[in-house]
């Protein structure tokens, strides 16, 4: 069981519903958001990125327990959020250096946990790419790095949300059938690793342990797992950690993400909510770029709101409270 300080527990409460479910909105994307704008044949400006994040925050945080933003483009959006929504701030540099092996992590050079806290962060989020079967020397560097981060968050008494994204150094395409077959092992083993106490992680933000596009009954063509096998991987995932954990949406469609959460619940998963990003807001980028702020607001007030409210209904029916996974150290 995770032991929280009173300060971390209060911060966790600010990020969650009263029931202890995390229904958070992620728009800390930087590189991915720029790519979405570029795909519409427009060169993105910093002001555009800031404005889009601000609109999403203003229109959608009334329906979220918290919002995840980056301090590079997201601080105006943080100020525009609903007063009841908690704030997570990202601490990692976007992307990774593809020229060096190992996808080594890096921090934003201008920021520290103290400075993010001063900007109003209720928690710190860090993204780590991790391959459990990577060269041990590379993984050793990652372990040491996360130990430092955990200690820095503990010193400032802020919850540490670690986002883990799996990969295989030998498989280039993470959407392939080949990768789908090894994904359960990759996801569940890395969760075991980073649940160890030396990392001081409070919440794991993780992928679902299978590629749903290759699950029997969901797969358009080839399958990597039967429904029963997939369900077992979800159950194994919950058994791999005693920490609160939440699912990321990984850019899949709103419909598939909701179906996935239902499948997880039926399998016995004890996930504690979601940090859902593109599945909620990605279709708002086009009206924003092509028709401006008013068109984007219209989309967010209708389709965007519908996406988040229908997701909230599914989360309420499928997620478990993290309250049962923690105890508070009042000392």
UniProtKB/Swiss-Prot annotation:
GO terms for biological process: 6-sulfoquinovose(1-) catabolic process; D-tagatose 6-phosphate catabolic process; lactose catabolic process via tagatose-6-phosphate. The keyword Disulfide bond does not apply. Pathway: Carbohydrate metabolism; D-tagatose 6-phosphate degradation; D-glyceraldehyde 3-phosphate and glycerone phosphate from D-tagatose 6-phosphate: step 2/2. The keyword Lyase applies. It is an enzyme of class 4 (lyase). It catalyses: D-tagatofuranose 1,6-bisphosphate = D-glyceraldehyde 3-phosphate + dihydroxyacetone phosphate. It comes from the Bacteria. Belongs to the aldolase LacD family. This is Tagatose 1,6-diphosphate aldolase 2. It comes from Enterococcus faecalis (strain ATCC 700802 / V583). The gene is lacD2.
